[in-house]
């Protein structure tokens, strides 16, 4: 029977290898307590690998290192998808707003754009005034503060006129600016009203010549001669033009192109030929007929010295004995390249000629015939 000392030494020697192996295994091969709770299924694989391979390292810690990356990828993928959907929604919203903005064009916007187009003629004088303020042309009359305020106002007005897409929000301000501009530049406002009315009336019935530079120039005769001077010869702006329905007697019209003379051999009315040409001069023509064939006469090609003109009335023509009624037109300036056919002398236009009863001959295509000498 063994002694107690031998039993204790045997037990210590038999237990020491187990403790040493357990300590080595706990340091290198086994996971921690937290890893045991989460991944209990992988605990047996290191032992089996260690038993079979011996020196092969255990892949336990490596798997633990890759797992957070997989989880992060799983979290980032939905996040990227959410961001992509938000960007797509924002783009769709921008497209919808742009379509709504383009489609919402009200009558006020169109009226604002039309007003800006009508007031384009004031941009040039406003620019000249602004340049004069910058160059010091008004230093004596205005202080520096007044000049700076004036320049700021003029720049704002010009900026509004150059942006017709601003919309009806500023329509009231534009109407106030229009009244102010017409007060500052009355000659430009009058010129726009006269030429605009005549062009609007002509554009309804005659083709427009955009390529002709002369057609764009304002008519000088309408600016100088008013309705009081022309009298009954002036055609009202609202009166419709019916070329085919005009009679041959007492024909009155205002035309903005040179007169096209019909051939003298034609026995019809002179209204069959439309006064459409390439020039832009304006004349007033009165056609009369007394039982016979109508006479035609066009305006002279050279300007006539300014003399007081009196309107030609059919009643005054009867006072002249021995004179046949003719077609008479007021003198205007025609283009240099316009060839016109001139006929025998026309009726007198001044009071002096009417009292004498002998009209002075004007430029004609036939040589003037000298009167027979009285015995």
UniProtKB/Swiss-Prot annotation:
Residues 1-102, 192-218, 351-375 are annotated as: Disordered. Residues 1-32 have a biased composition (Low complexity). It is found in: Nucleus; Nucleus, PML body. The keyword Transcription regulation applies. Induction: Expression in the liver oscillates in a circadian manner with highest levels at Zeitgeber time (ZT) 12 hours (at protein level). Expression in the heart, lung, stomach and kidney oscillate in a circadian manner with highest levels at approximately circadian time (CT) 12 hours. Its expression levels peak at circadian time 12 hours (CT12), 8 hours earlier than the peak of PER1/2 and CRY1/2 transcriptional repressors (peak CT20-CT24). Thus, it can repress the CLOCK-BMAL1 activity in a different time window compared to CRY and PER proteins. Disruption phenotype: Mice exhibit a longer circadian period of locomotor activity, alteration in the expression of core clock genes and impairment of the response of the circadian clock to stress. The peaks of DBP, NR1D1 and PER1 gene expression persists longer in the liver between Zeitgeber times (ZT) 12-14 hours. Residues 33-46 have a biased composition (Basic and acidic residues). One of its GO terms (biological process) is circadian regulation of gene expression. Pfam families: Ciart (PF15673). Keywords: Biological rhythms, Nucleus, Repressor, Transcription, Transcription regulation. GO terms for cellular component: nucleus; PML body. GO terms for molecular function: E-box binding; RNA polymerase II cis-regulatory region sequence-specific DNA binding. Interacts with BMAL1, PER2, CRY2, BHLHE41, HDAC1 NR3C1. Transcriptional repressor which forms a negative regulatory component of the circadian clock and acts independently of the circadian transcriptional repressors: CRY1, CRY2 and BHLHE41. In a histone deacetylase-dependent manner represses the transcriptional activator activity of the CLOCK-BMAL1 heterodimer. Abrogates the interaction of BMAL1 with the transcriptional coactivator CREBBP and can repress the histone acetyl-transferase activity of the CLOCK-BMAL1 heterodimer, reducing histone acetylation of its target genes. This is Circadian-associated transcriptional repressor.
């Amino acid at each position: 029977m063994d002694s107690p000392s031998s039993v204790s030494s045997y037990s210590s020697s038999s237990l020491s290898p187990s403790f040493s192996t357990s300590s080595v295994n706990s340091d290198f091969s086994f996971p921690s307590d937290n890893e045991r709770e989460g991944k209990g299924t992988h605990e047996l694989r290191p032992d089996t690998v260690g038993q079979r391979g011996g020196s092969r390292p255990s892949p336990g810690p490596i798997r633990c290192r890759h797992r957070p990356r997989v989880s992060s990828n799983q979290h980032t993928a939905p996040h990227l998808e959410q961001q992509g959907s938000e960007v797509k929604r924002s783009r769709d919203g921008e497209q919808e707003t742009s379509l709504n903005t383009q489609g919402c064009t009200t009558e006020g916007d169109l009226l604002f754009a039309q007003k800006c187009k009508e007031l384009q003629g004031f941009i040039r004088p406003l620019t000249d005034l602004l340049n004069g303020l910058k160059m010091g042309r008004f230093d004596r009359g205005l202080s520096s503060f007044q000049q700076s305020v004036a320049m700021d106002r003029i720049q704002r007005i010009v900026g509004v006129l150059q942006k017709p897409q601003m919309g009806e929000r500023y329509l009231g301000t534009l109407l106030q600016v229009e009244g102010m501009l017409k007060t500052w530049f009355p000659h430009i406002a009058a010129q726009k009203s006269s030429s605009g009315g005549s062009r609007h009336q002509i554009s309804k019935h005659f083709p427009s010549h955009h390529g002709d530079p002369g057609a764009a120039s304002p008519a000088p005769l309408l600016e100088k001669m008013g309705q009081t001077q022309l009298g009954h010869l002036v055609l009202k702006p609202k009166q419709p033009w019916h070329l085919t329905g005009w009679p041959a007697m007492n024909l009155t019209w205002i035309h903005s192109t040179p007169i096209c003379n019909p051939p003298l051999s034609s026995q019809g009315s002179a209204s069959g030929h439309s006064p459409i040409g390439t020039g832009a001069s304006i004349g007033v023509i009165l056609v009369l007929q007394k039982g016979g064939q109508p006479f035609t006469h066009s305006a002279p090609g050279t300007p006539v010295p300014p003399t007081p003109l009196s309107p030609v009335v059919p009643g005054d023509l009867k006072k002249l004995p021995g004179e046949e009624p003719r077609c008479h037109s007021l003198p205007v300036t025609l283009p240099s390249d316009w060839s016109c056919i001139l006929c025998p002398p026309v009726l007198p236009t001044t009071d002096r000629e009417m009292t004498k009863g002998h009209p002075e001959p004007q430029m004609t295509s036939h040589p003037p015939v000298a009167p027979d000498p009285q015995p």
